[in-house]
Amino acid sequence: MNYKIPVSVLVLVHTADLQVLLLERADRPGFWQSVTGSQDAGETLLQTAQRELAEETGIVAEASILTDWQRQNRYEIYAHWRNRYAPGVTHNTEHVFSLKLPAVQDIVLAPREHLDCQWLPWREAADCVFSWSNAEVIRELPLRMSQRT
């Protein structure tokens, strides 16, 4: 059996004026999140971020425009998803990236993964996501942006 690697990425897609892209999960309607996904064997984290971004949004981004936050979140894998991982694996390590776009743009959803998308001001987006790690990253966005200017 091919088990999932317990390493993933979260890619925060946003605009310069701090509009944040959220995707509604197909397997859990009403649950909103940023781009996320597990690392495939042989991929670097940056390659994982690029692949997930393209698969989930249709955005093809050069590696040079993705920002690696050098931040990791470790969290427990939900019990009902543990069968996807090797026996004994209980935690996942999530690596954070972001992509700043000049403006809101149309998104091409992966219909098996997401039902809908929306662009929200960062505060609303942070309140809308179901994952604590996603909310923390969104809340850090204004500070991160101010440090880059």
Model regions: which residues?
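Low-complexity, intrinsically disordered short peptide segments enriched in small/polar/basic residues
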Residues: 2, 6, 17, 74, ...
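Conserved N-terminal beta-strand and adjoining loop/helix that marks the start
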Residues: 1-20, 41
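Short, acidic/hydrophobic/Gly-rich beta-strand patch recurrent on exposed beta strands
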Residues: 22-25
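A conserved beta-turn-beta hairpin within the catalytic core of GNAT-like acetyltransferases
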Residues: 28-31
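Charged phosphate-binding loop/patch that engages nucleotide di/tri-phosphates or the phosphate backbone
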Residues: 126-149
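Unchanged
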Residues: 39-132
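A short gly/proline-enriched turn/hairpin at secondary-structure junctions
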Residues: 33-36
